[in-house]
Design a protein with these regions (language model features):
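Active-site microenvironment for binding and transforming phosphate-containing groups
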Residues: 1-255
Length: 255
């Protein structure tokens, strides 16, 4: 489990960037796989999610995650509860209610956790390149503001994701980023493979968030290279493995 000091210093807010350790799953899902969308046993996933929720002093049904679709859709949680196999389709969650854990699942995409400790408003988002480019982080901030958060008070951390030296992309990939802002060239460097590039997803997210007046940091962990600690879709794909586990990052307000 990883914690960011900026979030840990907030009174009344708990957060966790979980590694793949500490669960009951085996094989390629070893061991804290929290994704019902994987081929893992649902009973194992349920137990893993129960363990995650228990670290917050809550039950498995208090842990809310989404059917993530690489969108900019953000849901506001009031008294809502749902079981994960029937979760709503979106990529961000916000709430001002204690007693609920907001989770974002990832296996190379970036989990992003948000908090305004003074207003007691929190958020969690899943940001792959499509969601990052579309503005899922900014959409999450906007949804938090509707609950009373102030962007100048927000603490935001981009969690473990595919790293700045690991995310190789094709020749066509940079075009929409450069069309959005020519300075986004800063997040691409040439790959050893001709015509390809290496993309800095976390760096791109941190700058985008900063440009809407919110300070953000990144944990700096690379899910592709840290095999023992994180699930990685790309690593499994390169190894010829068709499925993968899902890691969880989560945040909650204390009662």
């Amino acid at each position: 489990m990883i914690q960011a000091k900026t979030l840990a210093d907030l009174s009344g807010v708990q957060h966790r960037f979980f590694t793949r350790k500490g669960g009951v799953s085996a094989g390629l899902y070893t061991s804290l796989n929290c994704g019902y969308g994987s081929g893992d046993s649902p009973d194992n996933v349920r137990e893993n999610r129960r363990r995650v929720a228990a670290t917050f002093g809550l039950g498995e049904l208090d842990l809310l995650t989404l059917h993530q679709i690489h969108s900019t859709e953000v849901l506001t949680v009031a008294t809502d509860r749902w079981t994960s196999p029937g979760a709503p389709k979106a990529d961000g969650l916000v709430t001002d209610r204690p007693g609920v854990v907001l989770g974002a699942m990832a296996a190379d995409c970036a989990p992003v956790l948000f908090a305004d400790g003074e207003a007691r408003v929190i958020g969690a988002a899943h940001a792959g390149w499509k969601g990052a480019l579309g503005g899922v982080a900014e959409a999450t901030i906007a949804a938090m503001e509707k609950l009373g958060a102030k962007r100048e008070r927000l603490t935001v951390v981009v969690g473990p994701c595919i790293g700045r030296d690991s995310y190789e992309v094709g020749p066509e990939f940079p075009a929409p980023f450069l069309a959005q802002d020519a300075s986004n060239k800063d997040f691409f460097k040439p790959s050893p493979r001709a015509g390809h590039f290496i993309f800095d997803l976390a760096g791109y997210l941190v700058r985008r968030i900063a440009r809407v007046g919110v300070a953000a940091t990144a944990t700096g962990h690379d899910t592709l290279t840290a095999t023992d600690d994180f699930f990685s879709y790309r690593r499994n794909t390169l190894d010829g493995v068709r499925d993968y586990g899902r890691g969880l990052s989560a945040i909650a307000l204390e009662k």
